Amino acid sequence: MGAEEEVLVTLSGGAPWGFRLHGGAEQRKPLQVSKIRRRSQAGRAGLRERDQLLAINGVSCTNLSHASAMSLIDASGNQLVLTVQRLADEGPVQSPSPHELQVLSPLSPLSPEPPGAPVPQPLQPGSLRSPPDSEAYYGETDSDADGPATQEKPRRPRRRGPTRPTPPGAPPDEVYLSDSPAEPAPTIPGPPSQGDSRVSSPSWEDGAALQPPPAEALLLPHGPLRPGPHLIPMVGPVPHPVAEDLTTTYTQKAKQAKLQRAESLQEKSIKEAKTKCRTIASLLTAAPNPHSKGVLMFKKRRQRAKKYTLVSFGAAAGTGAEEEDGVPPTSESELDEEAFSDARSLTNQSDWDSPYLDMELARAGSRASEGQGSGLGGQLSEVSGRGVQLFEQQRQRADSSTQELARVEPAAMLNGEGLQSPPRAQSAPPEAAVLPPSPLPAPVASPRPFQPGGGAPTPAPSIFNRSARPFTPGLQGQRPTTTSVIFRPLAPKRANDSLGGLSPAPPPFLSSQGPTPLPSFTSGVPSHAPVSGSPSTPRSSGPVTATSSLYIPAPSRPVTPGGAPEPPAPPSAAAMTSTASIFLSAPLRPSARPEAPAPGPGAPEPPSAREQRISVPAARTGILQEARRRGTRKQMFRPGKEETKNSPNPELLSLVQNLDEKPRAGGAESGPEEDALSLGAEACNFMQPVGARSYKTLPHVTPKTPPPMAPKTPPPMTPKTPPPVAPKPPSRGLLDGLVNGAASSAGIPEPPRLQGRGGELFAKRQSRADRYVVEGTPGPGLGPRPRSPSPTPSLPPSWKYSPNIRAPPPIAYNPLLSPFFPQAARTLPKAQSQGPRATPKQGIKALDFMRHQPYQLKTAMFCFDEVPPTPGPIASGSPKTARVQEIRRFSTPAPQPTAEPLAPTVLAPRAATTLDEPIWRTELASAPVPSPAPPPEAPRGLGASPSSCGFQVARPRFSATRTGLQAHVWRPGAGHQ
């Protein structure tokens, strides 16, 4: 080892100094610097590891214990003067001459002594001092990296044993240098003054090339001697960073300092989500492996979506242009062009996978004759969707009829053909945008017959239909007729006016549109025109074909309930390829619309609306946006049609939305809808299907005005998506309304039979509910007997699992006292006959006790006393207790109002009740909803006397009106019979 030298190191700035000592008198070892924290004051001042302390602030360390030395250091205040002894031959590791060390303040990075001064002059006190104002001792900031050296030095800390001695043969710098990537570990003992200078100078540039790292750098890896708290790095820029090594990233700082900058979870999650989205988007759009399954699937799916969305003529005046792929608005068409021209090369960038493109191209060949470049046109029709052809047709029409519209939407280009885009833009898309203003626009595109191969596209329209659900199966055959793409602007009424009777047509179109796409588009057109059967000038564009399937009746369009067969649009519009069906043609041929065949079923009026929506709003946004939207909007290519697919009956909907409102005077009077509502959202859903059934019956356009039945009749097609208006007589017999929304239209109690899927579901539900109705003691007539045999029997009466199964409440728990127990439940109707249980003694209305759970369809909700069973003797209940309490362990039963004599309520042993299962009201349960005579039987639950009150289903409303509480306290352990 080289000669030892004494160096005076002055640290300023106050603790923590950033070094550690080991040894001491107690260990009979000299006090030695075991570790220097990088970027600490000690490191900046030039203190080095393995330096032996000779004196601390002038106090000799010869006999100092470690603790004494520490206390001296701690007491040093803002300046610590250490006299240390270090090996002179350490070279770069050696501390630079005091002068050099003084230079340490980064400003003098290059000032250090010439390389010749590897061995610093023996301590010159004060020579090593870090600037007093420096935060450097803990300033671990990026600013530290400002020094030139910084750039050179990697930030990676070097890890060395704190006391690792330099091998005698090798210069210490070598040992340390191995750590620093930039500098080779020179074996030069201490010679390169550059190393030293580097040590002294913040920028080690001088010797950066191969010079050993500065002493500071060497020290950096080591932690300070001081206790942890002193080691906390200061976050903040250091005006004169000595070297990169002395600086660290904020992340490192935060870790070291355990600084957790509070970043709200929300911010974190947002950042993560953004990152993920970007990653996913980049992986999907510029996939490293374009042929990976995920990418291919994604592209295929995107193509499929485009097939059905592009048709939307990008109506949104270019807004729609937003690409799912993130391609610029008009890029859709451009993309398609590229895809077609470059299909294979574009695999990554283009929407189409090369394999998929290949297939599409092959298919496109058949359609090539369509008049679009076989590469482009064919693919577009196949890949992009008939939209391209449609656009072509529309473009032709638009050229004549919708040029003004053209400017509205150059975005039409989106649809696959860049070439066509201008005309296309002129054509449908503008129309789409304009359509609302001009409801009459006839199907713009004379269906350009797809190539005979076009048949394939037809299915696509079907798909549209499927998503739009505008058509009833019946329509399918006629759908070609509906082909006419009539844009009925969302302002359908105006459209109707202009069209004359056309508006009614939409319902017909539904039928005609039928989901069935014309298998042969080419031939389909002619047939479609005839189907239109309306003078509507069939756009002779031949294939009215399946395009019509795309039509989505615009619910907004008031169609005559009769489904006035005003031709929604000329079949020709439909003829426009199946794609055409997608595009909105309304604006293009306003006159045509009147032409549209009158056939109610055939009139596809809504399609234009849907088309319109698609095209107008058709702002296709990035894939991610689409995904984001998907959560709210289930449909991939939002059929913007307003027709309610199975939208709940408006009445039901209003009921559901108004659950919180007080029930209208009487449950029965409120009408079936109200009652259904009382049943809870779930029940409403069931009712809804019934409504849906009626909807199907009703022509899509059928306004509420038409009698519910009328709407059913007029539309032959009875689109599945009848206007949400499908009337449901609210007042119709309770049973009628409740049992069967459809029946309500009929207005006959019989409808309770429930027709259609909705009815079945409802009946099922009701039969199941009957089991749970607790009217009287579970008697022989117990729940097992359903109201009316439901078309599809549901679970056997034995089925008893309650929807709310949880641990039973504590025995002492009285639900009535629970803060959550609705007041309504506490106050039961006074009218309770005192007759035997068999008598319609109203047990707590299931709904009452369940009012706070309106969403659950519980048997109690259906208390229909169609056929009140003979009051069975109350099994365990007091014989004449008027009050029947359902014991739902988890729902608080509402005690019957004392209005009825407070006959002691008999609580059955807990075993008697299933969790959350009310004791059956056999009377109510037995009454089948379907029974046409709901009025005769007053629901026991509602009326004081079972027959006196019309069937009333308690509404899930909270009301404190009933104050009578039963004398008995309900105990969860006991079942109430």
Swiss-Prot record:
GO BP annotations listed: heart morphogenesis; positive regulation of actin filament bundle assembly; positive regulation of Rho protein signal transduction; positive regulation of stress fiber assembly; sarcomere organization
Residue positions of the PTM Phosphothreonine? 141, 705, 713, 792, 892, 898
- Tell me yes or no: is Cytoplasm among this UniProt entry's keywords: yes
Compartments in which it is found? Cytoplasm, Cytoskeleton
Q: Which GO terms describe its molecular function?
A: actin binding
Q: Which residues carry this modification: Asymmetric dimethylarginine?
A: 921
PDZ domain boundaries: 6-88
Q: Which InterPro entries does this entry report, sorted A to Z? A: PDZ, PDZ_sf, Synaptopodin_domain
Which portions of the sequence form the region Disordered?
91-226, 317-352, 364-677, 697-802, 922-950
Compositional bias (Polar residues): 194-203, 510-525
Q: Respond yes or no to whether keyword Lipid biosynthesis is given for this record.
A: no
| Pfam (any one) | PDZ
Cite the record's Pro residues compositional bias ranges.
Answer: 109-123, 183-192, 436-450, 596-607, 704-730, 781-796, 929-938
Task: Give start-end positions of Low complexity composition bias.
Answer: 216-226, 530-545, 572-595
Using the record's annotations, give every residue carrying the modification Omega-N-methylarginine: 386, 466, 469, 479, 757, 806, 826, 889, 910, 921, 955, 957
The principal location of this protein is: cytoplasm
Q: Which family does it belong to?
A: Belongs to the synaptopodin family.
Q: What does this protein do?
A: Actin-associated protein that may play a role in modulating actin-based shape.
Protein's name in the database: Synaptopodin 2-like protein
* Native source species: Homo sapiens (Human)
Q: Identify the gene encoding this protein.
A: SYNPO2L
